[in-house]
Amino acid sequence: MGAKDDKKRVKKLKSKKLEAEEELNNVQEIDAHDIVMEQKSDKKRGKKVKSKKAEAEEHEEELKRLQEKDPDFFQYMKEHDAELLKFDATEIEDDADVEPDTDLEDTEKEGDDEATKMEIAKKVHVQKTITASMVDAWSKSIEDEAKLGGVRSILRAYRTACHYGDDTGDDQSTKFSVMSSEVFNKIMIYVLSEMDGILRKLLRFPEDTRGTKETILELTNTRPWKNYNHLVKSYLGNSLHVLNQMTDTEMITFTLRRLKHSSVFLAAFPSLLRKYIKVALHFWGTGSGALPVVSLLFLRDLCIRLGSDCVDDCFKGMYKAYVLNCQFVNADKLKHISFLGNCFIELLGTDISAAYQHAFVFIRQLAMILREALNTKTKEAFRKVYQWKFIHCLELWTGAVCAYSSQSELRPVAYPLAQIITGVARLVPTARYTPLRLRCVRMLNRLAAATGTFIPVSMLLVDMLEMKELNRPPTGGVGKGVDLRTLLKVSKPAVKTRAFQEACVYTVVEELVEHLSQWSCSVAFFELSFIPTIRLRSFCKSTKAERFRKEMKQLISQIEANSEFVNKKRALIKFLPNDLAAESFLEDEKKAGKTPLLQYAEIIRQRAQQRNESLVESDVIVGENSAVFGKNAPSSDDEDDEDRMEKGAAAFNSSWLPGSDSKEKEPEEEKTKKKKRKRGGKSKTEKKQDEQGLGEDDVVEDFVLSSDEEEEDLFDIGGDKDEDDAVDEIADPETKTSKKTKGTYKTWHKAYKKTKKKKARVAS
């Protein structure tokens, strides 16, 4: 019985020692930085440490009493388990001032006494300067021996690196300090490349999957998560902090690409998730190079893995960023806007049901803006519709409906969208807004082709042929080539040129052929092409330009040939027009492209492409397939270790450190532009925009997607005015004032000449 009692007593002592050692380890694992912040918000932790210290002292007294009462058993313990008796309560007392780094995000209370700070600071260890050899030693201990201490040390160093240069005053609570950019780069490369895999092993994350929201929710109930979740939060929180400090595109791209693998852990930290979405949206909307692509992939990964937690925020934020990018438009920026639109459409595919809800709301807002313009007929209301933001939003939703036309969720918004586009095209039917109407026609053709629904586009096109500007001889000379794809409105002098007339007529022919070729195999082709054919014959009689007459006669002959081809096939069938069998009528001929109009449409497309290429001075091509992700887009998500390290070394190869002066020198081009503005001159781009009608009249800054905006009393367009004059007053606010000041023009012009001469002398 004595032996059994001895064993029980040994077990009891061992368990007490293990508990004490566990408490000691927990205290030793604490990060020194957060004790200052933690004790500001919670003073009860001091009591906790005191209770642990009291328990340790009590255990030490028990050992002393045991030696006095039962010296034989104490001797037995010395011989068989001497380690159990080696216990010192001062170990806890020495390390009782350190707290774990688990609160990286919560805001701390302010206003504690400076004396308390100084007392705590005295107990903290002296800061150590991190060297490259220390980083190598930590990484080796993690890789070879899988030591948890190495993980904690490298994360502390990572925190110090991310917060380097922060305005912390005389804060000495951090254990490490980074002194060189070489060490900073080394820490960043290693942690961003390897920490995701290390954390997954610690948390015993399933290896066969990258995880979803459900996986994380299950993981939060496990013991490894309770032990190591503060490491995950530390990694994600510090990474977010350094992302906000970075200025180099390659650094941000590499950091965001690596963080994408750990994005699933954000399901456990909702506030961090919102901040990451905000940062990624900012980089997507303003970044250059591969950064927008990587940001899109990051957001897409979040939407797929976390679902409803972030889908709404991502959709709304991306739509807002897209609209902001459409505020100021020129020929060079159209490609970027098209790319952003394709990114948004790609993101909508992650949750089509949620996409429908957002599409319904935003399309309804566009409809309300159009309705306001139709009801009020004010200059300001028209300008809200006839601007790039509104048109690009229509193109965005057109692309979305076309991309997901095979899915039933987005098909219901096709009809209201087509109604809005038709209303926009007919709002101000003048020659100066021909480019805008042609854009609307292209959108309607895309919708019709994607949904298989007939939309009466031909009337919008043949109405343009009857405009007086196209039936008069050109009084403005030949003029420069007009690219109608990059404009919403052309200038007054350009309307009177021969180049504008040719561009209008040829584009109308191209879009009309595109529309009719979609229904060239329809059983009702003769009926739907009858009225457009009559209107085209009328234009042939009225036009005085032989080149236009020749073009229209060729189109009419192709339409008649196609009608004859369809009528011959239709005479052989026995089903009624409302029969479902009508859908399969001439299906084989349509796939093979054997109808006369389909063959003619192919020729017209090639001619249009050649004409557009001759007008484009740069490599900007605007269209549904124009936006590409670029050469720097990652080919796959999985990278091997060497490739990962190489990319990291390429990104973190500069002497940049957080907190350093990131303000870059102003480019010489920007300086030149500013000098020209001061002298009153204009840049080449601005002059080109003035010639093409891309001036201030087409850019409206107060675009609001809401019907609640208060309207001011503006000039109302009456019905007795000439149509062109009315539209000029909408687009040119200075028209009225110029008539009033006509009498004082000479006086003003003399003063202007004198001022200009003075500026020229000062500039020289």
UniProtKB/Swiss-Prot annotation:
Matches recorded under InterPro entries: Noc2 (IPR005343)
Keywords: Coiled coil, Nucleus
Sections of the chain in a coiled coil: 3-69
Name of a matching Pfam family: Noc2
Motif position, Nuclear localization signal 1: 673-680
GO molecular function, one term: protein homodimerization activity
Motif segment (Nuclear localization signal 2): 738-745
Annotated family: Belongs to the NOC2 family.
Subunit field text: Component of nucleolar complexes. Forms homodimers. Interacts with RBL and NOC3 in both the nucleolus and nucleoplasm. Binds to SWA2.
Name listed for the protein in its UniProt record: Nucleolar complex-associated protein 2
Source organism of this protein record: Arabidopsis thaliana (Mouse-ear cress)
Gene coding for it: NOC2
